[in-house]
Amino acid sequence: QCGGQAAFETALSALLAECEIDLIVLAGFLTILSADFTARWPSRILNVHPSLIPAFCGKGMYGLKVHEAALRAGVKVTGATVHFVNEIPDGGRILLQKAVDVLPDDTPETLQRRVMEQAEWLLLPRAAELVSEQIVKEKRNA
């Protein structure tokens, strides 16, 4: 509907600027943003990923796929990461991480739910708060 990724990102940038948005928070956003887009929003785009990056991350690692990979690998601990977004999938600077135990009877679904409840839902608001506080300080000092 937007005419491809470049047109989508152009329209999104215009809307974000028009609304004077200072922070973009992604959760379940399955589009890889371009280097041009992320460069316009340095240290202003947050993403939550359902693993302890650098484990089980990158292109194609999302949703249940992450938890399936963790269970296949036999890890005893997984978790979630909030990081800044750059042009590399899950490659931006890490802000916060929280570990979650993998239980012997876990399925991808039970693990996904526990990681969301015990890590993602706690980390993402806290990271947004930390970055927002920094943005406010920068604006006051400008």
Each model region followed by its residue ranges:
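One-carbon transfer enzymes
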Residues: 1-142
